[in-house]
Amino acid sequence: MMITIRPDEISSIIREQIEQYNNEIQVVNMGTVLQVGDGIARIHGLYEVMAGELVEFEDSTVGIALNLETQNVGVVLMGDGLTIKEGSFVKTTGKIAQIPVSDAFLGRIVNALAQPIDGRGPIPASEFRLIESPAPGIVSRRSVYEPLQTGLIAIDSMIPIGRGQRELIIGDRQTGKTAVATDTILNQKGQNVVCVYVAIGQKASSVAQVVNMLRERSAMEYTIVVVEPADSPATLQYLAPYTGTALAEYFMYKKKHTLIIYDDLSKQAQAYRQMSLLLRRPPGREAYPGDVFYLHSRLLERAAKLNSQLGEGSITALPIVETQAGDVSAYIPTNVISITDGQIFLSSDLFNAGIRPAINVGLSVSRVGSAAQIKAMKQVAGKLKLELAQTAELEAFAQFASDLDKGTQDQLARGQRLRESLKQPQSTPLTVEEQIATIFTGTNGYLDRFDIREVKKFLDQLREYLKKKKPQFGEIIRTTKIFTEEAEALLREAIKEQTELFVVQQKN
């Protein structure tokens, strides 16, 4: 059987093929590896690469182009890079580092690339944010005016923190810096605040401890944990705080309040120093590169209180910095102190003396001040800092004076009881009304009759008594936010009744 060839059919097929032909040329910017090691690769031939652009190696390892030089490009690797060889190919991606963001991140543990590391499967996300995005401008902000309660009496009364503030937590190792931060997370329960805890270069066991504590106290429901432990590449330790901030910004621009904790920025600076020295950038003071101030300022400036047009969302930042032997004048501590709106100084001497949280009230300051306090707290805690400072001065004087007059002895005794009333066990944050009751009791001399060892027990019982027998007191403070005459009368009555009960208990 003869096959009849129809020329018109063939020509129509050819015409169709020509129409569908796509003659686009895909240009991929390629380079070759000159040298690789210590988490750094030098690449030749990567022309037109952007600063901070992601580049991809043959083995799918991703890196960031940080040093753009005339002959080559210095790339920091976001992985171990063990299979990258000299001469292997590298291509540009045309992307700047970005991460997926969504509400589904709440309750999850992720790494610096926002990939889940808690074994609970992928996190759905439809949106992306740049890891390094610009901070809100002056016009986009408003001044800090709402308190962010930490639940710690010493902080909320004397070093108040407001929503949108940056407050540094600084102190030697093992002085309870992380405890102050985690207690603040616990106190945000029911306050509609999203918390982000960024652990940089910490031991995996310490991070696991924090996560378990947050889980036990049902705080993981509103918390995201970003972890890059001590064995992570320096690049990822350097990126982790920016990743945490990008996640917090997602919620801030959705009109929510967020709290972010960087634990700690000393480790991030060390990771950045390591990267910079390996990239052969000139070292400066303490061998840190010249732009280490910019490293932290561009991070912390992203914490803000947005204006009403943008929805009044906020990011409150609590960066942690570790000092060596209490030296606040080292490079990183002075840098971060000058960037933040105040600092909480934790002293190892106070910690060892059993004063916990070990806050040195004399050296700690909040530059937002009473703008971040409710009126009731201002009314009660106004003289507290002054009284404690006078007590410290008197104690120094009393070491040299043999006999003190009655007035001085009374003032010393009251100061010691006040200091005792500020002690608080870890993971037991107090509500504002409980704090107000505690401070009022101390500053008005109601604790003077008790032995120092009885103060804690009495205050615990008083707070319980107020909750059960005088719930109106807490109601007044919560609704009016003012320490009214009625609230004062209720509190004085409760103190009187509880004192009588306590005295009877002690006798029995």
Curated annotation (Swiss-Prot):
PROSITE patterns for this protein: ATPASE_ALPHA_BETA (PS00152)
Top-level lineage group: Eukaryota
Binding residue positions for ATP: 171-178
Enzyme class label: translocase
Keywords for the protein's UniProt record, in alphabetical order: ATP synthesis, ATP-binding, CF(1), Chloroplast, Hydrogen ion transport, Ion transport, Membrane, Nucleotide-binding, Plastid, Thylakoid, Translocase, Transport
Entry keyword Lyase: no
Main subcellular location of this protein, as a coarse class: plastid
Keyword ATP-binding (UniProt): yes
Residues carrying the site annotation Required for activity: 364
EC number of the protein: 7.1.2.2
Membrane topology: Peripheral membrane protein
Any one GO molecular function term: ADP binding
Role description: Produces ATP from ADP in the presence of a proton gradient across the membrane. The alpha chain is a regulatory subunit.
Subunit structure and binding partners: F-type ATPases have 2 components, CF(1) - the catalytic core - and CF(0) - the membrane proton channel. CF(1) has five subunits: alpha(3), beta(3), gamma(1), delta(1), epsilon(1). CF(0) has four main subunits: a, b, b' and c.
Name under which the protein is recorded: ATP synthase subunit alpha, chloroplastic
Species name: Gnetum parvifolium
